[in-house]
């Protein structure tokens, strides 16, 4: 099974000098979606699209999939 990792998103925020709070406000994502991102849980394509629009990037720039150990 594959697990989403948003490490690249957090690195991109640092590069753009944005906080997670800034991202939350700019995208209008719900608090629960932001929590899912912090926990590396699955989020909707719509949420990823909003993030990419705000950060002017592609999905591959903010998320990667890693194998889960079972």
Regions found by a protein language model. Name each.
Residues 33-49:
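Amphipathic, hydrophobic secondary-structure cores in small proteins
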Residues 1-19:
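A short, Lys/Arg-rich alpha-helix, primarily the initiator
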Residues 13, 24, 38, 52:
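The alpha-helix within a helix-turn-helix
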């Amino acid at each position: 099974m594959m697990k989403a990792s948003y490490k690249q998103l957090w690195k991109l925020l640092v590069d753009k000098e944005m906080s997670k709070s800034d991202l939350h406000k700019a995208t209008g994502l719900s608090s629960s979606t932001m929590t899912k991102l912090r926990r590396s849980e699955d989020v909707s394509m719509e949420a990823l699209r909003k993030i990419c629009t705000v950060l002017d990037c592609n999905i591959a720039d903010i998320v990667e999939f890693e194998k889960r150990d079972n």
